[in-house]
Regions:
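Hydrophobic, membrane-interfacing alpha helices
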Residues: 1-283
Length: 283
């Protein structure tokens, strides 16, 4: 049985300025996204479906900047609304206290979508092409975020059989019982595995929106599965149908991804050509 090392959340102290590990993992996440995005620019399946205007590194940097804003603002608001609405409605100024923790992936996803809608319109880029470009680059950032959760010893898993070789005691939980290291499970499922699947899937020409759909389904399934090993939020517990809030929020992602993939498969592309395998009707 393992014991979490209880790492100091402050990685570096520069006078009055404390640099936290979690902040560094966010920087790592954005750096990995930028690296992945620049690699994506070199892939023929992406270049071959470019819309008006050529993509450049400046586009990637601006897109990342807006994405960061979407992640932070959407992630914070999502946590406040999805997980502690009563508290934050009674204490609205606490919403601004981001340094106290509390972010939601599902809220961050909505924030990113809104920011990229604005980016697509101002740069005359096809929205779904943009989202398909982003999707394979997201999981590595998610993996970095889960690494930050593990370093902080937060979001630990449910009780595990002590005989499980990787069962771990998290001193921060205060229980002293061995638990699943669910942060690592999520790092592997939502991060590494999902990245590999999406990267390989996106290497071939796909209809617009299908890579985005694959991300929604893939993340939703990975998160839904990992939630069975993650300790539910203490103030929420297990909800209806014995599911956690994370699972309930993942269901719309899975269903939305399936519907989006079907829609992309059956609709004519933006150039007016029918989907593969169909001929235009006689007029």
């Amino acid at each position: 049985m393992l014991v979490h090392p209880k790492i100091d959340p402050v990685a570096l102290q520069l006078g009055p300025i404390a640099i936290h590990w979690y902040g560094l993992t966010y920087l790592l996440a954005f750096g990995l996204f930028l690296l992945c995005a620049n690699l994506r620019l070199k892939h023929e399946p992406f270049r071959s479906v470019q819309g008006p205007g050529a993509w450049a590194r400046k586009d990637i940097e601006d897109m990342l900047f807006l994405g960061v804003l979407g992640v932070v603002i959407g992630g914070r608001l999502g946590y406040c609304l999805f997980y502690k609405p009563d508290f934050y409605l009674a204490n609205p100024l606490q919403i601004l206290y981001v340094w106290q923790g509390g972010m939601s992936f599902h809220g961050g996803l909505l924030g990113v979508i809104v920011s990229q809608i604005w980016f697509a319109r101002t740069r005359s880029k096809p929205f779904w092409q943009l989202m398909d470009f982003i999707a394979p680059c997201v999981p590595l950032g998610l993996a970095a975020g889960r690494l930050g959760n593990f370093i902080n010893g937060e979001l630990w898993g449910r009780a595990a059989d002590p005989s499980l070789p990787w069962a771990m005691v998290f001193p921060q939980s205060g229980s002293g019982i061995p638990r699943h290291p669910s942060q690592i499970y999520q790092l592997l499922l939502e991060g590494i595995l999902l990245f590999i699947v999406l990267w390989l899937y996106a290497r071939k020409q796909r209809k617009e929106a299908q890579v985005s759909a694959a991300f929604l389904v893939g993340y939703g399934v990975a998160r839904f599965t990992a939630e069975y090993f993650r300790e539910p939020d203490a103030h929420l517990g297990i909800l209806a149908l014995k599911m956690s809030m994370g699972q309930w929020l993942s269901i719309p992602m899975i269903l939305g991804g399936v519907l989006l993939w079907v829609w992309a498969e059956t609709r004519a592309d933006s150039a007016g050509r029918p989907p593969a395998g169909r001929r235009p009707a006689a007029r």
